[in-house]
Swiss-Prot record:
SUPFAM superfamilies hit by this protein: Ribosomal protein L36
GO MF: structural constituent of ribosome
Cellular component GO terms, alphabetical: cytoplasm; ribonucleoprotein complex; ribosome
GO aspect biological process, one term: translation
Species in which this protein is naturally found: Fusobacterium nucleatum subsp. nucleatum (strain ATCC 25586 / DSM 15643 / BCRC 10681 / CIP 101130 / JCM 8532 / KCTC 2640 / LMG 13131 / VPI 4355)
Pfam families on file: Ribosomal_L36
Name of this protein: Large ribosomal subunit protein bL36
Organismal lineage: Bacteria, Fusobacteriati, Fusobacteriota, Fusobacteriia, Fusobacteriales
PROSITE patterns per the UniProt record, alphabetical: RIBOSOMAL_L36
InterPro entries found in the cross-reference section: Ribosomal_bL36, Ribosomal_bL36_sp
Length: 37
């Protein structure tokens, strides 16, 4: 899980979702998980 100021999808399978007011990237690849913070 990476905490970044600006998040962007890394690959085609990355999806941007909003959960509890936080923007996240979820992906099949665990290395691509990101949260904005």
């Amino acid at each position: 899980m990476k905490v970044r100021v600006s998040i962007k999808p890394i690959c085609d399978k990355c999806k941007i979702i909003k959960r509890h007011g936080k923007i996240r990237v979820i992906c099949e690849n665990p290395k691509h998980k990101q949260v904005q913070g």
